[in-house]
From Swiss-Prot:
The glycine cleavage system catalyzes the degradation of glycine. It is an enzyme of class 2 (transferase). Signal peptide: none annotated. HAMAP family: GcvT (MF_00259). Keywords: Aminotransferase, Transferase. Transmembrane segments: none annotated. Gene3D superfamilies: Aminomethyltransferase beta-barrel domains, Aminomethyltransferase fragment, Probable tRNA modification gtpase trme, domain 1. It comes from Corynebacterium jeikeium (strain K411). This is Aminomethyltransferase. PANTHER family: AMINOMETHYLTRANSFERASE, AMINOMETHYLTRANSFERASE, MITOCHONDRIAL. It catalyses: N(6)-[(R)-S(8)-aminomethyldihydrolipoyl]-L-lysyl-[protein] + (6S)-5,6,7,8-tetrahydrofolate = N(6)-[(R)-dihydrolipoyl]-L-lysyl-[protein] + (6R)-5,10-methylene-5,6,7,8-tetrahydrofolate + NH4(+). Belongs to the GcvT family. The glycine cleavage system is composed of four proteins: P, T, L and H. The lineage of its organism: Bacteria, Bacillati, Actinomycetota, Actinomycetes, Mycobacteriales.
Length: 389
């Protein structure tokens, strides 16, 4: 059995009494006390997460932008320095290898953040696509940590966590002072600075549906940054948070999870994210022909939101039925009792024909088989939860 990887903060989590779980080959904190308390801390105050299992892949060289236009489905050359883009890397047949965020740090420098379980596949795919491009792909994942500060009071905490602004690209919106940088930093934008004496990349990104920041730091500086982040969070009613609440937070926000809503068997079009593919502005990229074909033919399934009553949550794999029909029209991909809303919510792929006919259209009632008994769920618009802005 392969030994699980540990983040640079593992001992810190042990001292905090964390319960751990295997996630993408990493021994990660599932929760520290109550996942409900942690969830509510992020929704109402601030939560601090160790996301060091996520990958960091640096792409540099005179043709870095052109290379990523070829390797990813979006047009990365159009991203300004200081900004970031959510995109995907696909196979030639259009299957999703991973969904990822790419930061443009310079004219010829990008930082890609893939999901933990897909780092090796992403690096392999990128390196296999470098032929003909003057570019280098370096996997820095094992030397790098990521700490997320998420919630309505995240910006307030960051004012004390960040000490100096080193480089704030104009497109990022960040100003020269810490206050101007935190207040002005746009969503999906980043600047380099100093936090707790450590060089960090500060990004306004997250996976919770709340305002939030992610700090990327070298492993040897991770504990110092974590400690300062936790000190500030505690003063604002915040908590350390594990992956259990991160999952319910992202589910409420209607955000897809690789392995649940996204996979090699699905194209971006299948997942309702065909808009990410720059099929009009790019003549060629890996997977383009397959994605164009999928757009033309249309998908046979649709990702929908489901809201139930009571306390019984639908889980991944549970079948969805049109009313009292005998044949399943789809299956749940993610589901949980929503801590914020107080009722079960779920994401599910269902047949497009069921949506077109009205049987699984927004406002319709479907049934989910939960351990042999059917429960009614209403088809609702996504996201389930949206913060006030």
């Amino acid at each position: 059995m392969t030994e699980l990887k540990k983040t640079a903060l593992h001992l810190v989590h042990e001292k905090l009494g964390a319960r751990f779980t295997d996630f993408g080959g990493w021994d990660m904190p599932l929760k520290y006390s109550s996942e409900l308390d942690e969830h509510h801390a992020v929704r109402n105050a601030v939560g601090v997460f160790d996301l060091s299992h996520m990958g960091e892949v640096r792409v540099t060289g005179p043709q870095a932008a052109e290379f990523l236009d070829h390797a990813l489905i979006s047009k990365l050359s159009a991203v300004k320095v200081g900004k970031a883009k959510y995109s995907m890397i696909c196979t030639e047949s259009g299957g999703i290898i991973d969904d990822l965020i790419t930061y443009r740090l310079g004219d010829n420098e990008f930082l890609i953040v893939p999901n933990a379980g897909n780092v090796d596949n992403v690096v392999s795919a990128l390196q296999g696509r470098t032929e003909g491009f003057d570019v280098e792909v370096n996997n820095e994942s094992d030397a790098t940590s990521m700490i997320a500060v998420q919630g309505p009071k995240a910006a307030q905490a960051m004012l004390e966590i960040v000490e100096n602004v080193v480089d704030a690209p104009e497109a990022s919106g960040a100003g020269e002072t810490v206050a101007e940088a935190i207040e002005g930093l746009g969503y999906y934008a980043a600047f380099s600075g100093v936090a707790a004496g450590q060089p960090v990349l500060v990004a306004r990104t997250g996976y919770t549906g709340e305002d939030g920041f992610e700090l990327i730091v070298a492993n040897d500086g991770a504990e110092t940054v974590w400690t300062k982040a936790m000190d500030q969070a505690a003063q604002l009613g915040g908590l350390p948070c594990g992956l259990a609440c991160r999952d319910t937070l992202r589910l409420e926000a209607g955000m897809p999870l690789y392995g649940n809503e996204l996979s090699l068997k699905l194209t971006p079009v299948d997942a309702g994210l065909g808009i990410l593919a720059a099929t009009k502005s790019k003549d060629s990229f890996v997977g383009r022909d397959a994605i164009v074909s999928a757009k033309e033919k249309g998908t046979q399934q649709v990702l929908i939101g489901l809201a139930g009553e009571g306390r019984r949550a639908a889980r991944g794999g549970y079948e969805v039925f049109a009313g009292d029909g005998e044949k399943a029209i789809g299956a749940v991909t993610s589901g949980a009792l929503s801590p914020t809303l107080g009722h079960p919510v779920a994401l599910a792929y269902v047949a497009k024909s069921a949506v077109s006919s009205g049987a699984a259209a927004e406002g319709a009632t479907v049934e989910v088989d939960i351990r042999g008994k059917r429960f009614e769920y209403k088809v609702v618009a996504l996201p389930f939860y949206s913060r006030e802005k």
